[in-house]
Amino acid sequence: MNFIPQLLAAEKTNQSMLCVGLDPEPARFPAPWQGDARRIFDFCAAIVDATADQVIAFKPQIAYFAAHRAEDQLERLIAHIHQVAPQVPVILDAKRGDIGSTAQQYAVEAFERYRADALTLSPFMGFDSIEPYLQYDGKGLLLLCRTSNPGGSDLQAQRLAGPADRTPGAPGAPGELLFEHIARLAAGPWNRSGRLGLVVGATYPAEIARVRALAPTLPLLIPGVGAQGGDAQATVRAGWRGGTGQSSGQTSGQTSGQTSGQTSGQTTGPIIVSSSRAVLYASAAADFASAARAVASATRQALQAARAPG
């Protein structure tokens, strides 16, 4: 199944916007697995089995596996997810970004070796660094846009000078912020296949609303809820298709009379709200899987409840 239809099906079946991030740290595993990297698959598979009916997606972070020479366990884990929860897409969080020939190899890694359903990418090197991934029909690509870390502002919140004669509201127009430029490109000329999405941190709800206004039909992967401090209600209100935060479409360089014409009524893209540590390490005891399920269930319900205005 193609990534976006699969995502929408999981959202409907599980009534969920929650994505569980799989970031295994052996030092935090329960006894007797604590410190044993050979148990990465066992730990993550137990989390998957306990939460599969609570999520819209799973998101393994490749560095947490590669650091422990556990890439083979990552392969097994993704295969396990596809077996026990075939309706739930797997987003491989790798944030790849390189020139075309190297990107081709990263695409083989993600979609042939690991058989992920979607992949996170850095758009910094431009469209030709993304094209090789588009050769894989049905696979989703989620581009970094406004990330949850404080240092993201060093680049993503910088204003573009742009050509003085650029049409207002077009990508690269003077006064546009870099993250806005990325959102416009992803929603417009780069999205030829209809399989792009954007990554926007839960720690910046105003920016989520802005990105949603610029990209009303794209899926938004929103990390940062839970241990990173993102607020579930603010996140949903800003990004959900029925939310209240994406109504104006006004850029930071526009007046109140100049808008993009994109409103919440046109918003169809799902949101994928990711939580990792709060779920994975809800308990350090033998009940870690049931504790993870309890946290995932509570988070899912909080996200669903946040859809209601008021």
Where do the model's predicted regions map?
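Conserved N-terminal beta1-alpha1 strand-loop-helix module at the mouth
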Residues: M1-P60, F65-Q87, R166, D287-F288, ...
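Acidic (Asp/Glu)-rich catalytic clusters
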Residues: E11-T13, V48-Q54, I78-A85, P132-D137, ...
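Conserved, mostly hydrophobic/aromatic
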Residues: V20, F58, D93, L119, ...
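Conserved anion-binding
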Residues: P26, A31, D98-V199, T217
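Active-site-adjacent beta->alpha loops and helix N-cap segments on the catalytic face
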Residues: A67-Q83, I99-A103, P123-G138, A202-R212, ...
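A C-terminal functional module that forms or caps the active site or interfaces directly
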Residues: A202-G245, G265-V273
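C-terminal helical cap(s) of enzyme catalytic domains, especially alpha/beta-barrels
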Residues: T235-G242, Q266, P270, Y281-G310
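Long, intrinsically disordered low-complexity tandem-repeat segments
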Residues: Q246-Q266
